[in-house]
């Protein structure tokens, strides 16, 4: 078995992107830069999301916050898992052999990303129930049922990819930065079809069906409200501003997150299907599509922070609290600092 960090067996280390190897640094420079950069972004971004959710109570009013926080924790674990290939590429010795390391890494990342995919599907179902059954929503969607659903998401995602340890085939290309995974662990067309039929296809169909109906119903509600306002305004001689469906704006935020997820994952899924069915492989394509898909773990943070006003207020409140605590800590350390008698002006969320 070849090792990616054993310099005695090869003149230079194994690199998926051969163009990124430099003799001066003796490691795969381009791969290290991409993976370490994404790892830092994913970990820092999702830590911020988790802290904001804990510090902004208004964000927890929606039941979808359960699933969004689940995605944030799963994405955070993706970032932590990416430390393994980062350290391996930098020649830090791994605690277990390379074959087991890349299998476990590929399995863990596949499970975590499928948790995000299943959570997005559950979010769309939750919003669909809120739109179609508003009167019975609180009795249908309870905190206990949400926790049970999250537990089933983790269990189901684990079971879908568990056969990869029983010689069913490779679940993805996440571990291909290790030489054993790239050269000795191959995909299987039947296992790939199994993953697509059990996870990718159902999640995509659920999302398409629910959001199509959500926006259709919201459009109908908006039209009815506009017609009623027009009749009322004509009777009273007043003009009112048209109102939109109250759930449509929040659904748009979730739809953006879902759309970006599938846009970033679509090249990976297409390549996964083509490579496992035809046997034609490309190291460059597998690396780029895989890490493009993994980059979604950071994109969720960006979309939510830019689209959700409550999240923005929570983020400002968190940053304000941190700045205030840092300022008070600095003032306490400096005995010559003149302290104000009154509390600093500011709003707390």
UniProtKB/Swiss-Prot annotation:
Stretches in topological domain Cytoplasmic: 54-75, 126-147, 213-252, 305-349
Highest taxon in the source lineage: Eukaryota
Cited SUPFAM superfamilies: Family A G protein-coupled receptor-like
Extracellular side: 1-32, 97-104, 169-191, 274-283
Nucleus among keywords: no
Locations listed in the record: Cell membrane
Main location: membrane
Keywords: Cell membrane, G-protein coupled receptor, Glycoprotein, Membrane, Receptor, Transducer, Transmembrane, Transmembrane helix
Sites carrying sugar chains: 2, 8
The keyword Transmembrane is annotated on this UniProt entry: yes
Sequence intervals crossing the membrane: 33-53, 76-96, 105-125, 148-168, 192-212, 253-273, 284-304
InterPro entries linked to this entry: GPCR_opsins, GPCR_Rhodpsn, GPCR_Rhodpsn_7TM
Cellular component per GO, a single term: plasma membrane
Bilayer topology annotation: Multi-pass membrane protein
Function description: Orphan receptor.
Name of this protein: Probable G-protein coupled receptor 21
Species of provenance: Mus musculus (Mouse)
